[in-house]
Amino acid sequence: MASNGKSNAVSVCPGPIKRREFLRIGLSGFATLSLPGLFELRARAATEKPKARTAVILVWLRGGASHLETYDPKPDAPSEFRGVFSPISTCVPGMQISELLPRHAKIADKFTLLRSMAHTGGGHPAGSLQMLTGDPDPQDKDKPIFPDWMTVANFLRADPKRPLPNYVGVNPVTRYDNFTIAGPAYVGPSYGPFTVNGDPNDPHFSVPNIGYKDQAQSERLSDRIRLKQSLDRLDRAIDQSGTMRAIDDFEAQALSLLTSPGAREAFDLSREPDHIRDLYGRNQWGQQCLLARRLVEAGVEIITTTFDGPLCGRVANWDDHAVNHNVFDALKFRAPYFDQAVSALIEDIYARGLDKRVLVVVTGEFGRTPRIERVASSGGGVASAAAGTVQPGRDHWPRAFSNLWAGGGIKTGGVIGATDKHGEEVVSRMCTPGDFLATIYRHLGIDAGQITIPDFSGRPNLILPRGAPIPELERQS
């Protein structure tokens, strides 16, 4: 197992790094970091290095989507389980999905469904931490104690010589209410996401601090950086730890973000033709996915995008309890946006020849209870009916749920695993969060069972102590 045997002397990050903070840190240096083994660790990380630099786009359904109303319908179950929507056939013989997803159905040959995910985290924080960090603890926590896979991959694969950050969160996966559901933990905040907030469909949307449009500004900044580098020359000459080398790299990337026209262009959706923007949908989720595609084309390797907010309905996420709103009304409202955005992303990835390099994963922290709950509305906050109105809902269900995999060179047009006739329990090919994460790491060329990263005390920790890549999702030669 590879380890540099030393820790990063940094504090735990409470959330993603803001754009200004990212650039400020990059330009002021990382004097507090202890990084002598970083470059050796990165060199050892990719024991099965892909032929091309691979990428992952994670579409996160915050709150947990119902598997029965998306990828694992149960038309033969009793009415108290099956819900009001019917299944439809897809272009893949024998594969059915919810009628809410007709666009998915037309491109089912381009994705694989995993219907047998299960874990023990019944709360939003615990479920999210299990899926994103591999933490097996079923109890909720305020913040992660293990780094999420995105931060780890960024730590191991970051190349500061490129003009763009390697990990971008487009409406990032970081929080659920007051809980931090993803973060760098002991890897250190400098490897968190470059965050892009706001609605990319807004005509006034822009990403601040990316690429000066004024060439004179760029030249003045470059002059200042060159002056700073000349003053630092003596320190670099006597440095033996590798720390100054790391500072050079972080400074180079921060400068590149500010001065590179290519960096600015990658985030500029106005450069897309109208028919492509229409393909994804002229709404927040559609344009988030389009931005994700632009970023992987530009070389970004780790992208997360969260589907929540107004397009989910009044609850603003996928947490479809009856006390919040009528689950079926909510799903009927949000499904067209979800269906179009995800299907367009998959189609576009294949149309552009990115399907071998880019893996798309769609999931939430868990599924929803197969047995429909009928509970009186709370009548307040995000509730969709007057207080006392009895309405249907589905609660948290981590014991069996589904996710979607597309691209990544995997064999598509299939289904992995199965749940019972009610969708309550996994009956074949159970997969755990460790398996889920190991599969993502494998696509990124990272041997998760061998690489260690030191924690705050300097003790080496396997980046994934349990789990194995899912064989059915292995890249095809």
Predicted regions: what they are:
Residues M1-S477:
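Ligand-binding pockets and gating/stacking loops
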